[in-house]
């Protein structure tokens, strides 16, 4: 439990036994939040003498001479953050699958390779991550932002493809930097949106990230946006010192993929049969393909690059597809059947 504006003020840590239900966690957190709120409200009246042990402890967490106004605001700014150690370690291990590719893409785009640590904040490098506002994939693109750089429809959703999404993220970050002129604001814009960041910059100045962090009160500039760049710096620090924080951890190895660009449309089942793999294997390594393809109402589109681990096929993809014959290919996509 901590103050949402002054992150140095950590009121306490609550240990939850393994298996504690969500409802019980919420009950215990709410109970402690209410108790802390009462203490802060009491201190905000100016009380500084005859303090209880809890009042003295809470007051000692704030700088000497803290104002009643600050304490009054703090009573309404108590935030709970669940521990992330296990999730971060899992994401760190997963990052090895795509890290080299991301860094190479970012170099080509003139984006600092350190920004490859950003998915630790966004998704813990989980390609199946979905947010409550509809953001998707390791880079957590929303549909509206993603469509600027990727294909997103009922056939393909490239947000869920780590390669396409990483390339798109590099382009978005490079564009944000071209407008803001500095990386703290370009990275903040990745979360908050460029228009909101530009409003803050007009109010406080182009290079006033610290002022914006402390004092900007835009309507949608909440905790996540305000602290997004700081969270990135923290994630980068842990990423760069992973052996210290996670002794014995190992990065996942990048998969050695065989790839093939389709010259025509094809049903997922026909492609799986031709390659000698299951549709489940095909789906696991081609995450942009939507459910309409696996259900058979749409073909895998012409021009799509298909990936499979080299170990999953016993010949080159070109050879396997050439030997499958012409009957499996189609010149057109299946028509929509919406009602």
Task: List each model region and its residues.
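Extreme N-terminal leader/anchor segments
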Residues: 1-72
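Extracytoplasmic and endomembrane cell-envelope/extracellular-matrix remodeling and assembly machinery
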Residues: 53-101, 108-109, 148, 152-179, ...
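Auxiliary, metal-adjacent structural segments of Zn-dependent hydrolase domains
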Residues: 103, 107, 112-115, 126
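Alpha-helical scaffolds flanking conserved acidic
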Residues: 112-119, 136, 183-188
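Alpha-helix N-capping/helix-start residues
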Residues: 112-113, 143, 279
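Short, surface-exposed glycine/acidic/tryptophan-bearing loops
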Residues: 129-149, 206
């Amino acid at each position: 439990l901590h103050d949402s504006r002054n992150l140095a003020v950590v009121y306490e840590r609550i240990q939850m036994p393994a298996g504690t239900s969500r409802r019980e966690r919420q009950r215990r957190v709410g109970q402690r939040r209410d108790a802390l709120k009462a203490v802060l409200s009491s201190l905000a009246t100016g009380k500084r003498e005859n303090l209880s042990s809890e009042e003295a402890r809470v007051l000692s967490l704030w700088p000497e001479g803290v104002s009643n106004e600050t304490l009054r605001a703090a009573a309404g700014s108590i935030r709970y953050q669940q521990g992330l150690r296990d999730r971060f370690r899992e994401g760190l291990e997963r990052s090895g699958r795509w890290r080299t590719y991301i860094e190479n893409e970012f170099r080509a785009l003139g984006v600092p390779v350190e920004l490859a640590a950003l998915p630790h904040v966004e998704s813990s490098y989980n390609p199946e991550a979905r947010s409550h506002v509809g953001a998707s994939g390791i880079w957590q693109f929303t549909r509206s932002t993603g469509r600027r750089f990727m294909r997103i429809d009922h056939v393909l959703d490239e947000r869920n493809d780590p390669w396409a999404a990483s390339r798109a993220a590099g382009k978005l970050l490079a564009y944000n930097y071209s407008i803001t002129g500095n990386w703290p604001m370009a990275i903040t814009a990745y979360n908050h949106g460029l228009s909101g960041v530009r409003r803050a910059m007009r109010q406080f100045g182009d290079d006033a990230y610290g002022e914006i962090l402390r004092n900007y009160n835009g309507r949608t500039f909440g905790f996540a946006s305000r602290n997004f760049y700081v969270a990135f710096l923290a994630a980068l620090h842990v990423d760069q010192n992973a052996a210290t924080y996670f002794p014995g951890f190992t990065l996942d190895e990048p998969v050695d993929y065989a790839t093939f660009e389709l010259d025509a449309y094809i049903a997922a089942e026909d492609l799986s049969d031709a390659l000698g793999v299951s549709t489940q294997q095909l789906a696991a390594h081609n995450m942009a393909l939507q459910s309409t393809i696996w259900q058979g109402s749409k073909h895998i589109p012409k021009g799509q690059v298909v990936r499979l681990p080299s170990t999953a096929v016993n010949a080159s993809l070109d050879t396997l597809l050439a030997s499958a014959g012409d009957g499996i290919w189609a010149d057109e996509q299946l028509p929509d059947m919406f009602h």
